[in-house]
Amino acid sequence: MCIRDRKYPELKEALEDLPIKVWAGSDAIAQVVQAKPIDMVLTAMVGYAGLKPTIAAIKAGKAIALANKETLVVAGELITALAAEYKVPILPVDSEHSAIFQCLNGAYDNPVEKLLLTASGGPFRQKTMEELALVKKEQALKHPNWHMGAKITIDSASMMNKGFEVIEAKWLFGVQPSQIEVVVHPQ
């Protein structure tokens, strides 16, 4: 069990008579993912927080189910090199990348020429550059299609998320950015 630092002493005391290990601190998740009975680790933390646990899991020989694109955005070269060194598969969980992965599964003798990623264009796709300069945070937080957390909503509205997905695809599928095309379509 992992817990925030401030509650650690209280929980540890409450569970001291039970066969439950309690971790706390910034290294807690990295310690947990190395546990013996675990064979696959789902990394679904937002942002840079997923990097350290992912590295620890790879070095412990655990398969990675990746739902944290930022890990590959900030350290794709390192993560893919470690995965190759430790013979650990990286399995994309995110919808588009998972679909591409499934399509490519078993197509070893058929090299990828191009990957297509789709984007709605966000709520501001019809705006001019001048209009975009006047957009307020509150407008960006009102996504027309779905409700998500603030960071992903801003990243989606600004198309930053799609940029992250291009970088993620580069590392997941071993292709060059020139082989990745983003098709913008409102639906």
PLM features per residue range, with description:
Residues 11, 48-60, 69-88:
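Rossmann-fold NAD(P)-binding glycine/threonine-rich loop
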Residues 1-3:
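Short, small-residue-biased leader/transition segments that mark boundaries at the very start
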Residues 22-25, 42-43, 66-67, 90-94, ...:
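General beta-strand structural signal in soluble alpha/beta enzymes
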Residues 8-9, 29-30, 71-74, 97-99, ...:
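Short gly/pro/ser/thr-enriched loop/turn and capping motifs at secondary-structure boundaries
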Residues 153-187:
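Substrate-binding/catalytic subdomain of NAD(P)-dependent oxidoreductase enzymes
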Residues 24-56:
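Beta-loop-alpha module in the N-terminal Rossmann-like domain of NAD(P)-dependent dehydrogenases
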Residues 97-161:
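Conserved anion/nucleotide-ligand pocket segment
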Residues 7-24, 36-39:
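Internal alpha/beta domain cores that form substrate/cofactor-binding pockets in large enzymes
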